[in-house]
Amino acid sequence: MNVEASEGISFRLQAAIYRESVALVEAGVCDAGDVDRVITNSIGRRWSVGGPFEIWEQIGWDLVQVIAGELVSEISAATSASEIVVPDVCESTGFTGSSSSAASKFQNVAVIGAGLLGHGIALELAVHGKQVFLNDVSDYLLSDAISRARVGLKALASVGRISEDQIEHALTHISTSTDLGESVKNADLVIEAASENIDLKKNIFAEIDSSAPTHSVLASNSSTFVPSAYGSVTNRTSRVVGIHYFNPPHLLPGIEIITGPDTSSEVVSLVKDEYEAIGKKPAVVRIEIQGFISNRLQVALLREAMSTVESGEATAAEIDDIVRNGFGPKFAEIGVFGSVSHSDMSELFAELNNDCELPNILLDKIESGDLGVK
């Protein structure tokens, strides 16, 4: 592929991300600063080391089908600059609810689900001195989670993020139990990190609500479901919020805080302040919307990338190379709004793919059983 063709594809891929970013800001879902926080602290870092095909190959194309299938018809299809309002990045300050000192209020944290994300959430909170109550359905799963937490802590020590002495100290801050009620009875914050099954999550939230103290904030790490979907079974919808971590949670600083229709500004501020105090970079999603910020941007990129492959302009490997060695590192450093020109990007809107159906290239992978790395 020659340089001119590569640059043309790169600009279109960036325009797809930019178009959806602007649409989110215009809709009041978040501000420009929130978009760039998500990019620089999570998905942009992924793009800088692996393009969209490499990333989704690791996740699994069957899961991509679920995520993209729900979003492909919802992401922006604006074809001209006149259809959007350019956000003023300089005025983007993030969520500005009532300020609270959250560090002293979330000392005891229950993590429900000790799997891939749950154990990472637990170990990061433990490193920062929180007393963590890790819960799952079997002692085997909990034992395995502690083993993986130890590995994660050693990895942090190996790169100088923590000292060797902090490994064992952090582990002493993690208690395990298969009794859900016991795990949440003293919790200031409960983070549900179970499988992406709404009925399961509702059952967990109903039990948590009946067992946790009335002051507890109840959160879900779901990347799919919004707070009203699981919080509706509780008697404290004002204290229910989404806290969407990125994998691996102890290495990527970004999180998305998703507010439900009843979530109080005090709770959002508590969560935001607490996570900022331990070094996380929260972006507040102010309106319930499918895919939040992160998945919508990733699907916008993937749709344009797959369209480019289907048209024969580039291979998947070439697309990954363009992202990984082109704009990926730039986006990881300064985000989308600090990286691109509105006039340059908006000129490309009319050229972008606007299909509302899943690309054939994805459907072919699913049909052939090519599900990626499992």
Predicted regions located by residue number:
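Hydrophobic packing residues within well-ordered alpha-helices of enzyme cores
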Residues: 145, 208, 227-231
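Rossmann-fold dinucleotide-binding core
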Residues: 1-12, 217-287, 291, 295
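Structural motif
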Residues: 112, 177, 193, 220-222, ...
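Residues forming the Rossmann-fold NAD(P)(H) cofactor-binding site
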Residues: 119-120
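NAD(P)-dependent Rossmann-like dehydrogenase/reductase catalytic/cofactor-binding core
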Residues: 1-8, 16, 22-114, 123-130, ...
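Glycine-rich phosphate-binding loop and adjoining beta1-alpha1-beta2 segment
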Residues: 130, 135-162
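Rossmann-like NAD(P)-binding element
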Residues: 116, 140-141, 155-217, 225
